[in-house]
Amino acid sequence: MRVNGACKLQLAGAVLLATLLSSCLQPQRVPQTAPPPAAATAPLPPPARPGLPYDIVADESLLIVLAYRGGPLASAGHNHLIASHALAGSFHVPADVLQSTFEVRIPVATLSVDEPTLRAHEDPGSFPPDVPDGARQGTRRNMLGPALLNAERDPEIVLRSLSIVPAAVPGAVGEAEGSVLATIESTVAGTVRTVRVPVHYRLAAATLEASGDMPLRQSDLGLTPFSALLGALVVQDEMHVRFHIIARVGAGAAPQ
């Protein structure tokens, strides 16, 4: 069958119309865009602690730990005096002293062993002045080593207050002076423990004085006392701790 020119034009127009209609009926693809990157969130600063800030004065502060020999061969060892002259940190003291907070940091590498001038103030029967250099150096090496304080891994001992309550004596807490019992979170050699420490404080002329004297077991801090010769020579678990801290209000400091 022959198709004339008019029919050919009609057929071509129909095909073109069908093509246009089919393209209109297809859903249009909306180009997808990647979601915008999340805005970087800066870490929030720690909340301000209430009270007037006092900074520890290292040159006027001192921590002393008395460690005692034990075991069947105790007479072959020495009692040792460990000290820090490098205490750092701060106290924040509001009008209500019991709401005070503090943080004390002790750089482990600065701990000394058996300073003659400090031993001279102790009972000479328990702490004679003549400790051999080898014994002093060996004790410090063992103390800073991985089996005890692990100074290379954990360079600081950190003490943070958790709560403060009056000591169990009448009139223990005053605005200028008093005695309290502080519950402290201690971090020693990476181990976190909670201990209670009696503190006597005095506030005068922009200066805070805090002192204490107490027995404390190494195991309370998560430490294992040093032992040698299969336990024949040991360091006793119980130590004696004394501290005297001076902190002062910095220039321009104001209650927060």
Predicted features and spans:
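Low-complexity, acidic/polar, glycine-enriched regions of mature
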Residues: 24-256
